[in-house]
């Protein structure tokens, strides 16, 4: 149905925005000066597609961009980025400990981090942390 298709598109847009925000966070940990070209090379995306995404993120209040093109996360952008990064590192580490090879674990964690609800992620995290601490 059209409604389902619209929801799928919105989910893809949300997933893409989360991916960009997480990438900006990771890049800024390596080097505080992040530009669109850095994001493009990190994700292997074209510069024009990154520019469009940055415009959308800026208009929605997730990033700031100065006159020289340097990008910083806003408070709400950083919150989302940190949530995605925590999910990504936790899920990929967990999958690796379960015996999944690193490449697959990282790819799967990358997909899972965007679709899992906060409730489910927190429950998994509590369960695993509980097992490891007992």
Tell me the role of every PLM-derived stretch:
Residues 69-87:
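Basic, amphipathic "hinge/linker" alpha-helix immediately C-terminal to the N-terminal HTH DNA-binding motif
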Residues 1-16:
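N-terminal leader segment of winged-helix/HTH proteins
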Residues 12-45:
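N-terminal helix-turn-helix DNA-binding core of bacterial DNA-binding proteins
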Residues 16-19, 35, 76, 87, ...:
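N-terminal positioning helix adjacent to the helix-turn-helix/winged-helix DNA-binding module
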Residues 42, 80, 97:
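Residues within the alpha-helical elements of helix-turn-helix
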Residues 36-67:
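Canonical helix-turn-helix DNA-binding module
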Residues 85-118:
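Arg/Lys-rich, alpha-helical DNA-contact motif
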Residues 1-4, 107-134:
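C-terminal regulatory/oligomerization modules of transcriptional regulators
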């Amino acid at each position: 149905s059209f409604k389902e298709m619209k929801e799928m598109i919105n989910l893809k847009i949300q997933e893409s925005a989360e991916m960009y925000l997480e990438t900006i966070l990771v890049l800024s940990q390596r080097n505080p000066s992040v530009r669109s070209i850095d994001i493009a090379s990190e994700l292997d995306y074209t510069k024009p597609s990154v520019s469009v995404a940055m415009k959308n993120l800026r208009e929605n209040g997730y990033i700031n961009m100065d006159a020289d093109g340097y990008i910083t996360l806003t408070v709400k952008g950083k919150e989302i980025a940190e949530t995605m990064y925590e999910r990504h590192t936790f899920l990929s580490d967990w999958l690796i400990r379960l015996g999944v090879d690193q490449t697959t674990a990282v790819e799967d964690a990358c997909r899972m981090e965007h679709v899992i609800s906060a409730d489910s992620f927190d429950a998994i995290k509590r369960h695993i942390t509980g097992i490891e601490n007992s």
